[in-house]
Amino acid sequence: MLRMSQSKGTVWAIASSRRFSQVSVLLPILGILAATPLQARPITPAVDGTGTVVTKDGNRFDINGGSLSSDSTNLFHSFEEFGLSEGQIANFLSNPQIQNILGRVVGGDASIINGLIQVTGGNSNLFLMNPAGIVFGANARLNVPADFMATTATGIGFGDKNWFNGFGSNDYLNLVGTPNRFAFDLSPGGSIINAGNLRVGRGDNLTLLGGTVVSSGQVSAPGGEITISAVPGERLVRVSQPGSMLSLEIELPRDQDGLLLPIKPLDLAGLLTGQGGNVETGLRVNSDGNVQLAGSDFGVRNRDVVAKNVTAQTATLSAANNLILVESRLQTRGDLNLLARNTVLVRDSVANPFVAHAGRNLYIQGNRSIDILALNHVSQTPFVSGGNLSLVSNGIISGDAHFASGGSLAMLNLSGEPGNFVSLYDPIISANGDVVFGNYNGVALKVEATGSISGGDIVITGADTSGSIPTTDPHYTELTTSRALILQAGKTTLDNAPNLPQSSVGETNFTSPLEDLLPRGSIQVGNITTQSGVNGIDSGSITLEALGNIITGNVFSRTAGGVFNSQNNAGNITIISRGGSIDTSAGSVDAGASIGSGGNITLMAQKDITTSTLFSYVIRSDGGSAGNINITSKEGSINTTAGNGQILTVAPQKTGQVMLIASGDITTGTISSDGNLGGGDITIKSENGSINTAAGTL
């Protein structure tokens, strides 16, 4: 879906009436700034009875006349051609009564605009419609007093049935009120390219709406909303009022004679090569016909959206296919929405960072997948939100970047359930709220939150060797040298806090998705494994720290099963709840090894601790020592009888100690500390309760 923007009492919003369908994730190849052979055709009025008059005065084209609606608030123009060369000005003449100026281009050629578009004499919104395509060159600029929209729609609707048609006749007198629909009769719809610097005034809105939209230049709407959207062909886009969503109606609007419209827009490659001249657009067409942005390896297809530089109060970028963000700088003081029917693709480079900073909520949805790789700039966190940060997909969420949220952070599927994510190189997540995700598979992971953490199964596959973790991070060594997992909930101070001015956040009410499910500052995850199946590579340490409760399934930092000759060491397992309870009864806690050494297991809670089997062992007779197992409950009880209910530290050499200390009752199964060269001490101490070992042996 696309989010909404305010425009002097009108909200422009675009959304799908149904879930975006799943489409192929495959992309062609992309590349960067190149001179594109396009030539601006002069501004020529259409001879169709609309009454548009164009007067040339040096480099300025004064646009007057036209047709008015019956209430004189909407002014309509019709052009055979509309283009500007460098240094030229299109001057739309208005008056204080005119709220909207709408211009159409009917000649069948794309508009090549490499000069200035302005409105004088009134504070009118300006709509420019050319179904054949619109190109803003590197020298394109705006000087408009209100909102601006460029669209390749074939019609702009007023009310339920009145249309400003892109071709044919119009009943201008009946086109009253505010434009609220946009018809795209052609498939694919025409393309829009912006290589210029398009800027509207403070509080005004800027919209680029087409079949494919590529903005390699700058778009700015300080205090207003930017919408950049590629829509499917043969759709009707409806404008909604605040609080509602807009639909893409499945119908094929025709012209008044019932015939298909008389042009076929050029695709992106045809638009770039078909009209001669030289306008810098930031695009090139390869010999195989693929369109490329400079400096990347991802191509641009029909219905894609590409955006490079966006600055606004709020912004929505929405693609009917892929949303491609290469070296982009996207900055809003309010919400930022990044949406794709297929894939949201993000890349930085060694030369240029990727930045998506939202003063309020940052929402990223790729229906098929989210593909993020932005690790080249250690000093700058790519994804930062003052409010909540959401990554939503029914496919894989690949998050090789650092994420910092001033609210909660959630990785979800389209149904709102926790979504799975992977990272091949380096994920760091920091949230001033809750963190929610499904299963994780990837390299060493750190998640820190002032709220709670809820996750699925976690598999750590290697150390983080990307070089993108700041050396100032207190877990730098663990993360960069081992298969480490670090989950920290209920923190008062984040190691990697979001860096946004407080004024950007405003009065956002941050939502806590876990507040009804877990006590604040809790951790609940599925099975955890940091085990290594590669000889000579140790298993990673596991650290879970929370203010509230901690609940887990299996917790494995052992050498992988079946690797009998592995000389790996197991990792240490540390689970600490500063104010709640610990429950690992749904699985085993295992820090065993084959030939190497077993890891230490430490469980410490303010309240009760409930466990199943706890293992630190060494299998082979030529192996090392087993680790210590320490369980401490400061104000609660300890019960280790779930499942098999065993506590074992066993090794052919020495074993560690076993220590259980609680304020309340202690109930155990079998406890063993057995080593050929000496077993460790077993200590069981209850300060105010009873000790029951009847369920096993010591």
Go through each PLM region and give its residues.
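Extracellular and secretory-pathway beta-repeat/beta-biased strand scaffolds
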Residues: L2-L698
